Amino acid sequence: MKSSQDDLYAKPYQQVSDFQFDNKVAGVFNDMIRRSVPGYGQIINTIGDLAQKYATPNSKIYDLGCSLGAATLSVRRRVEGRNCQIIAVDNSESMIERCKENLSAYVSETPVKLVCGDIRDIEIENASLVILNFTMQFLAPEHRQSLLKKIYDGLQPGGLLVLSEKLYFEQDKIQSTLDDLHLDFKRANGYSELEISQKRSSLEHVMKPDTLEQHKIRIKQQGFSQFSVWFQCFNFASMVAIK
């Protein structure tokens, strides 16, 4: 399905409501994330590469917070012939409906089970790969460790978690510098000062980024044997953890 241009915050609002993944956002999401998240295309492509390396025959692959299915599509193209099943989960009905249309545009022998629900309620089992692509940051902080435990318990030995997140930096000058670079990235992609300001206000109470150290500690506490950042641009990073 073709994505419209993101102009959701182009006109001034008297009061900016909290960001939610509703039908309006789903309709412009491809354009929004491409113009807002530096390196997003590279992350999606590399998730497919990682799936090719880590997906084991007859295993399950989970895309938790699948949105329109970009990561699922990238994975599905790279795991054909392995009898894998992909479980793609999102709590937005609008996202799931558009994801279904996007997936149906391509023929594949790898089945995808679409689930509209809370990722905290999903049973994870026999997983060779679990993807959290800019999802954890929207989950209440007190639920993040328990979700990681569920993922760890459901992964096969040697299984891979891909975790992409916006990061917060405790060093104030580093935080402000990387934040400024990100805002310049959005300006270069055509967003106005009004759009940037209103979008930021809408996300203020919804998205709660962690520091890289918080991610490291949480993953180590859960028992993952290896962890690394494989991609970072400004204050956006993608990490891998191996069980």
UniProtKB/Swiss-Prot annotation:
CDD domains: AdoMet_MTases
Binding site for S-adenosyl-L-methionine: 40, 65-67, 90-91, 118-119, 133, 200
Entry EC no(s): 2.1.3.-
Assembly information from the UniProt record: Homodimer.
Transferase recorded as keyword: yes
Organism: Shewanella piezotolerans (strain WP3 / JCM 13877)
The keyword S-adenosyl-L-methionine appears for this protein: yes
Lineage of producing organism: Bacteria, Pseudomonadati, Pseudomonadota, Gammaproteobacteria, Alteromonadales
UniProt keywords, alphabetically: S-adenosyl-L-methionine, Transferase
Broad class of enzyme this protein falls into: transferase
Protein's name according to its UniProt entry: Carboxy-S-adenosyl-L-methionine synthase
Functional summary from the UniProt entry: Catalyzes the conversion of S-adenosyl-L-methionine (SAM) to carboxy-S-adenosyl-L-methionine (Cx-SAM).
Catalysed reaction equations from the record: prephenate + S-adenosyl-L-methionine = carboxy-S-adenosyl-L-methionine + 3-phenylpyruvate + H2O
Gene3D superfamilies: Vaccinia Virus protein VP39
GO biological process: tRNA wobble uridine modification
GO MF term (any one): carboxyl- or carbamoyltransferase activity
HAMAP family for this protein: Cx_SAM_synthase (MF_01589)
Family as reported in the entry's similarity comment: Belongs to the class I-like SAM-binding methyltransferase superfamily. Cx-SAM synthase family.
Lineage: superkingdom: Bacteria
